[in-house]
Amino acid sequence: MNLLCFGDSLMQLNGPDTYPQEGWPQELGPYLRDGVGVYDFAKNGRSTKSFLDEGLFEEGLERAKKGDIALISFGHNDEKSEDPTRYTTPYGTYQENLKGMIDALAKKGVKSILLTSIARFRYNEDGTLKLTHGEYPEAMRQLAKKIDVPLVDLNKLTREYLSNHPEKENQRFYMNFGPHLYPNYPEGKDDHTHMRKEGAKWICSLVVPELKKIRFASELFC
């Protein structure tokens, strides 16, 4: 049994040249039982539309085998209305694309789990967390309910955590730091979206307990 990851840069495999940036599935290893493989097909900057149009989903589908489990998480780039190659409407093409992936995987005997987008590290002047993903998390929630597919509400989980901890403490999770900390980024980084290694570990600590509650996914984990 393998775990297949379909998504954007928050899930993408990162190498030494972008350290400390990581996609959160890179930190799943310690939680998994022996023999469980992780195949990460996620790609930076992709929406459901561009992921399908570029054939990236098809690459993963070809590798999928009966009994595998797919984690699907898009939304950060679907909202980019200025880019017709990526933009989708929340309750239209976004839901249609997600359902299309789920249906195609199901035909190969693969069960899917949807995950809403991770909250961005952006705050209002009063210190409250900004809403930065529009209707996409809710659109995914409604789709999951409609077609009876399990959902991990990562948007809600991360928003709750970030809202209950100090901004300075939360900063350590994101690629948001000053100069001279990492050789790859001598001038620092002002990134409110992507995860550092510690952030990837944090996301796994939120995701894994939720996945264990899903009967068909629980056997993946120690």
Kindly give the residue locations of the regions a language model identified.
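Gly/Ser/Thr-rich beta-alpha loop segments that engage phosphate groups in nucleotides
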Residues: S9, S47, N77
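Structural motif
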Residues: S47-G55
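Serine-esterase "nucleophile elbow" of acetyl-processing enzymes
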Residues: M1-K43, E58-K66, A70
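Glycine/Thr-rich phosphate-binding loops of Rossmann-like dinucleotide-binding domains
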Residues: L13, T48-K49, K80
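Alpha-helical cap/lid subdomain in secreted, periplasmic
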Residues: G55-K201, S205-C222
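Generic, ordered loop/turn and secondary-structure boundary motif
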Residues: M11, R33, L52, H194-R196
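Short, charged N-terminal helix-start/capping segments
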Residues: N2-F6, F41-R46, K130-M140
